[in-house]
Design a protein with these regions (language model features):
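Conserved beta-alpha-beta core of the PfkB/ribokinase-like small-molecule kinase fold
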Residues: 5-8, 13-89, 95-96, 105-106
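Conserved phosphate-binding/catalytic region of the ribokinase-like
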Residues: 27-28, 79-199
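Generic, low-specificity signal for short hydrophobic/alpha-helical stretches with a mild N-terminal bias
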Residues: 4-11, 39-42, 72, 122, ...
Length: 199
């Protein structure tokens, strides 16, 4: 009938008719009861200018339940460089859970329980950082999906666990070349978490 989580980026917002189609799909999914996930994933080369990008990327925020941005996108989405302030602003605009990725430092999560830092994992070597943010968010959404909770039911402890899982996925992803081939399997992620817990 409808997906549990409906995920969208901003690339389909760059031009018509894709922009209107994206809004139609998001509104339809939300009306059907789907959780809306959004990763703006700003790519300057795909927009005519930054002002246009800001306008259209921000236009989707009011429909979103779960949102992931990088620390390089905070100012673009909120006019604030500080990750804590940016996350709080997005939450106040209606986003239930905001995750700001911080590269190797981990992620900052903001929700109804306030904000918390979730540190990253140590990596053996960095081969390729492409896909690190996507792999983090994929891992995070996997945990949201399997929790069977609505976004506003998630506790800070839940979110710390989900972000830790996402950080583990990302740490494995950057150790291999190629964003897609580098995506780890569940057993690898669980092993990475177990190793870090005992080290």
């Amino acid at each position: 009938d409808h997906p549990h989580i409906f995920h969208v980026g901003s690339l389909s917002l760059t031009d018509q008719p894709a922009r209107d189609t994206t809004f139609y799909a998001v509104k339809r999914a939300k009306n059907k009861g789907s959780v809306i996930s959004y990763d703006p994933n700003y790519r300057a080369s795909l927009w005519p200018d930054e002002k246009t990008a800001k306008k259209h990327m921000r236009s989707l925020v009011s429909y979103v339940d779960l949102m992931k941005i990088s620390d390089e996108e905070t100012e673009l989405l909120t006019d604030h460089k500080d990750v804590r302030e940016a996350a709080k602003i997005l939450y106040e605009q209606g986003v239930k859970v905001v995750a700001v990725t911080l590269g190797g430092e981990g992620a900052y999560i903001y929700s109804k329980d306030g904000g918390c830092m979730v540190p990253g994992f140590s990596v053996k070597q960095i081969a390729d950082t492409n896909g690190a943010g996507d792999s983090f968010w994929g891992g995070f959404l996997y945990k949201v999906s399997t929790s069977e909770k609505q976004p506003d039911e998630l506790t800070q402890e839940d979110l710390k666990e989900f972000a830790r899982f996402g950080n583990a996925v990302a740490s494995l992803c950057v150790e291999e070349k190629g964003a897609i081939p580098a995506m780890p399997e569940l057993a690898q992620v669980e092993r990475r978490i177990a190793e870090e817990s005992y080290s």
